[in-house]
Design a protein with these regions (language model features):
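Positively charged n-region of N-terminal signal peptides that target proteins for export
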Residues: 1-4, 19-20
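Sec-dependent signal peptide hydrophobic core
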Residues: 5-10
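C-terminal motif of bacterial Sec signal peptides marking the signal peptidase cleavage site
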Residues: 14-17
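Conserved positions within compact, well-structured domain cores
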Residues: 21-212
Length: 212
């Protein structure tokens, strides 16, 4: 009997550790927070069960995870901007179409990946504090209205390896980098800074979905 109680207690602790604060709503089974920005932000990464979970890693323009993240297995790697358009990867606004947007493909409804401008808005209009959430390093990001989300430092995947988890965060946008056939926009952070950049499309990075 004591063993049963212990199991139940541990299960309750696990549920509490994954319970987010300040949730504003739910769409297609996934909760979001209104930070007072142009879009609403999911409380967790794509593929994660709670805010501090890393979630899944995606190459840019792919909607499923995989074992190896390299140039050969990434269909968008090496494609010019015009080629991305002609093959249907990006639409008229220059961002990934629904078919190739990992957030839309996996969560459905109106969920999608953030654009480069929306990521930069999150970066520049919010207050970022390096912290831990249930022993997971990352940033507490507070919006103009006082609401917040947690972004774990989930690292990234190259080939079969997970690198720099716990110290770096790497998040994709849906926007390709026009000056390179190999890169797309995302943002990167460590314990001291956060900035926008362009990164190899074949690398496995995390995604924080958004809603209009």
């Amino acid at each position: 009997m004591r063993k049963i109680y212990l199991i139940m207690a541990l299960a309750c602790m696990a549920l509490v550790s994954c319970k987010p604060d300040g949730v504003d709503g739910k769409h297609h089974g996934h909760e979001y927070v209104d930070l007072g920005l142009s879009v609403k932000w999911a409380i967790s990464n794509l593929g994660a069960s709670c805010p501090e979970d890393y979630g899944h890693y995606f190459a840019w323009g792919e909607t499923t995870t995989k074992e190896i993240y390299d140039e050969e297995s990434c269909p968008t790697y090496g494609l010019s901007y015009s080629k991305l358009q002609s093959e249907g990867y990006i639409g008229d606004k220059g961002n990934l179409t629904e078919e190739f947007d990992a957030a839309t493909a996996n969560w459905g409804g109106d969920w999608r990946m953030p654009t480069d401008k929306e990521l930069d808005e999150l970066r520049t209009k919010c207050t970022w504090t390096w912290t831990t959430n249930n022993d997971v390093y990352g940033y507490n990001v507070v919006g103009p209205n006082g609401n917040s989300i947690f972004l774990p430092a989930a690292g990234s995947r190259s080939w079969s390896s997970l690198m720099f988890d716990g110290s770096l965060g790497n998040y994709w946008s849906s926007t390709p980098y026009m000056l390179s056939n190999d890169n797309a926009y995302g943002f990167y952070f460590n314990s001291g800074s956060c900035y926008m950049g362009s990164y190899d499309r074949n690398s496995g990075r995390t995604i924080r979905p958004v809603l209009e």
